[in-house]
A protein has these predicted regions:
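Conserved class I S-adenosyl-L-methionine
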Residues: 1-38, 139-171
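Class I SAM-dependent methyltransferase SAM/SAH-binding core
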Residues: 44, 50-96
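A conserved beta-strand element that flanks and buttresses the S-adenosyl-L-methionine
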Residues: 108
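Acceptor-substrate binding/catalytic loop of class I
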Residues: 116, 189-204
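A short glycine-rich, Lys/Arg-flanked "PGG" loop and its adjoining helix->strand segment in the class I
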Residues: 122-134
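Conserved S-adenosyl-L-methionine
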Residues: 214-225
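Core SAM-dependent methyltransferase catalytic element
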Residues: 232-255
C-alpha cells in the first residue's frame, strides 16, 4: 500500500475501493460529522481518496484540509470537489514521518490506517494526535477483525451447503484467501484482494486509545450487506451482517 499502489488504484477508484459513505445506510458517519460541526471550526480528512466525504465536511466546517498519499487521488478529489472553495489539498504520507500540519478541531479518518506495518500505523496515530487541537474530536473508521473472521465462517457454511465436506469447505476459504500467513493473522492482517490489510479488534481499539492522549467516547458497528463481502450471496445469508468499526474520541486538554 505504497504511493505507487494508490496512484494506480486512483484510475479505477470507484470500482477498486469500497465506499464506506455509499454503504453507510444509517448515515452514522454523516450524523456524527454534523454533531461536531461548527461554522467557526476547522477539519481534516486524512486519507481523503478522491474526496467522497469532502462535500459533507465543507458544508459543516469553516475550512477543510484534504490529505492523501497519492497525487492522482488528490487530482480527482480537486476535480470532483471543484465547487468547494474552503478546501485545501495536501499530498502527504502521514505514516513515514512527522510533517508540519495546521491544527484542526475535527479529524475524519476512514479506512486509512490499514497498512500492515505496525511502525507506520503508530506514526500515523501520532500524526493524528499532533494535528488535532486539545479538546478536538476524531472520527475513525477501521476494518473489523471480528467481522473478517465471521465472514470466513459464513463462507465455510456456504461451501458446506453447496455440498463440500467441512474440511474441504475450510480449505476452499483458505486457498481463496491466498493462503493467509499465520503470522499476519496473529496481527489482525487479512488479505483483501491479495493485499495485506490491517483489521482491528474492538478490545484492541480500546487498548490503543488508552495509550493515546484521547478519551474514547464510542465504538460501534457500521453494518453492511453481504454483497460487500461476496458476489451473489445466497438469500438465506442474513443478519448478523459484516461491519467496520466506527470510533469517536476526544483529545484530552492539557492540564
Amino acid at each position: 500500500m505504497d504511493v505507487a499502489y494508490w496512484n494506480r488504484v486512483a484510475e479505477q477508484y470507484d470500482s477498486e475501493i469500497f465506499s464506506v459513505l455509499a454503504h453507510d445506510e444509517n448515515n452514522l458517519i454523516r450524523t456524527r460529522i454534523q454533531k461536531f460541526a461548527s461554522e467557526t471550526k476547522t477539519a481534516s480528512d486524512l486519507g481523503c481518496g478522491i474526496g467522497k466525504f469532502l462535500p459533507i465536511l465543507s458544508q459543516n466546517f469553516r475550512h477543510v484540509y484534504a490529505y492523501d498519499i497519492a497525487e492522482k487521488c488528490l487530482e480527482q478529489a480537486r476535480e470532483n470537489c471543484a465547487n468547494l472553495s474552503n478546501v485545501d489539498y495536501v499530498r502527504a504520507d502521514l505514516s513515514i514521518r512527522e510533517i508540519i500540519m495546521p491544527k484542526v478541531d475535527f479529524i475524519l479518518c476512514v479506512n486509512s490506517i490499514i497498512m500492515p506495518s505496525m511502525s507506520k500505523r503508530s506514526r500515523y496515530f501520532t500524526s493524528i494526535s499532533n494535528h488535532l487541537n486539545d479538546g478536538g474530536h476524531l472520527l475513525l473508521v477501521v476494518p473489523s477483525f471480528e467481522s473478517a473472521t465471521y465472514s470466513s465462517i459464513r463462507l465455510i457454511e456456504w461451501n458446506q451447503r453447496r455440498g463440500l465436506s467441512y474440511g474441504a469447505a475450510v480449505m476452499a476459504v483458505w486457498n481463496g484467501n491466498n493462503k493467509q500467513k499465520p503470522s499476519h493473522l496473529q496481527q489482525g492482517i487479512v488479505n483483501i484482494d491479495h493485499v495485506p490489510t490491517k483489521h482491528y479488534l474492538k478490545e484492541e481499539l480500546c487498548a490503543l486509545f488508552q495509550g493515546l492522549n484521547f478519551d474514547l467516547h464510542e465504538i460501534r458497528k457500521i453494518e453492511y450487506g453481504w454483497k460487500t463481502e461476496f458476489s451473489n450471496p445466497p438469500k438465506w445469508m442474513k443478519e448478523p451482517y459484516p461491519w467496520d468499526w466506527l470510533v469517536t474520541a476526544r483529545k484530552r486538554q492539557k492540564k
